[in-house]
């Protein structure tokens, strides 16, 4: 069975370093929150960035932490007027039998505003 784990984080500036650091932080917290022990458990990871983030691909950061064999995709988020700026979003597809209600989604920094309904928004 495949489950989706959602996450998002904001960055203060559009630099490769900021995007890579935030992406690594978010991915590692998503894995930890869900008890994922090996990247082999991941079917794929999809990243989106808001249109104001253009200096780096989030997928590069995933490779930096060892996700060399996980299919990765970076794309641009829909530019909705008034939406939160400088956001990196993630959808990780996880091969697991974990029930849907036990999957922990992770929202960090200003991105907690995107999902105030979730306990795991930190």
From Swiss-Prot:
Biological process according to GO: amino acid biosynthetic process; aromatic amino acid family biosynthetic process; chorismate metabolic process
SUPFAM superfamilies xref list: YjgF-like
Pathway: Metabolic intermediate biosynthesis; prephenate biosynthesis; prephenate from chorismate: step 1/1
Gene3D superfamilies noted in UniProt: RutC-like
Enzyme class: isomerase
Chief place where the protein resides: cytoplasm
Subcellular location(s) per record: Cytoplasm
Temperature impact on function: Optimum temperature is 70 degrees Celsius.
Binding locations of prephenate: 6, 89, 107
Keyword annotations: Amino-acid biosynthesis, Aromatic amino acid biosynthesis, Cytoplasm, Isomerase
Location of the Chorismate mutase aroH-type domain: 2-120
EC code(s) of this entry: 5.4.99.5
Gene Ontology cellular component terms for the protein in this record: cytoplasm
CDD domains: AroH
Domain of life: Bacteria
A single MF term (Gene Ontology): chorismate mutase activity
Catalytic activity, reaction form: chorismate = prephenate
Activity regulation remarks: Inhibited by 40% with 500 uM tyrosine, and a tyrosine concentration as high as 5 mM reduced activity to 5%.
Alphabetical list of InterPro entries matching this protein: Chorismate_mutase_AroH, RutC-like_sf
NCBIfam families assigned: CM_mono_aroH
Function: Catalyzes the Claisen rearrangement of chorismate to prephenate. Probably involved in the aromatic amino acid biosynthesis.
Assembly and interaction partners: Homotrimer.
Protein name: Chorismate mutase AroH
